[in-house]
Amino acid sequence: MAGILLVAFLSLAFGTTEGASGSSWSYGESDGPGHWESAYPNCGLNRQSPINLPNSQDMVYNSDLKPFMLKGFKNPQDYKLKILNNGHTVQVNVEEGDLTVEGGGLPGRFKTAQFHFHWGSDNMRGSEHLSDGSSYPMELHVVNYNEKYGSLSNAASKERDGLAVLGFFFVISDEENSGLRTMLNKFKDVKTNGAMTELTSFSIESMLPLAVGNPDHFYRYSGSLTTPPCHESVVWTIFENAISISEQQMAMFRKLLEDNLTNGTHVIVNNFRPVQPLGERQVMRSFELNSASNIHLSSLALFLFLVCFI
């Protein structure tokens, strides 16, 4: 019963069509992000997500942002996962297991509840957050709740420290990402809205780039859920290192359907909220700048800028 209730809330808070008020929402024109505030007032508050992450030079260095400790993510036999198409995204729920996130300057110990994706109709868009004005083809959100609140539903309604979401950008690569293969093989079973199945033998750790490059390089700000009801209870972390994905693998996401019919024609694409005003909030970085990192960031920005015009 607890698992059913958890799935029900996850669907409500992170991607169903119907909210508690019965109001519908989507990413379309009639009930898309520009209309969310009328049914979900929180969506019009001043600490909303996503945002445009400024250049690292314009961020504030925070020495308290130490490396993360992710526990329980490595061995698939230690947890039970279910993969779901909720009509807005593909989502993987943690049904059983003790997956936790702490460190990284987080205000406590957080329990992992689910992860999901946002992607575009092409490689020029898709991520919810922007990096100095540039978009990525996809973004992964790993959703965790503060254990002191006891449950995801209780934590999501709290102020500022209820949830911790880890965000990762994706970049297109010539090589297939083997860490995604097991999950992508299940897409045929969750092609339509409402479809759900078990996801076995999938190592969450293998999907994440935390063991590659600089896992202690990340950005931090205070924000909200990026879907209704838009609670401003999220400690956001966006990692500098991106996850690679091949063109063929990316195409599999774009074949998932909003419809609950196998012959449906409405594919899930452009399921991202536009960036929201940063306002008086600060974006912090976990690392000090040096000439090498400045060159890296400048080169990345130039590459993304040039790609837009090829």
Predicted segment positions?
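Alpha-carbonic anhydrase
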Residues: 1-310
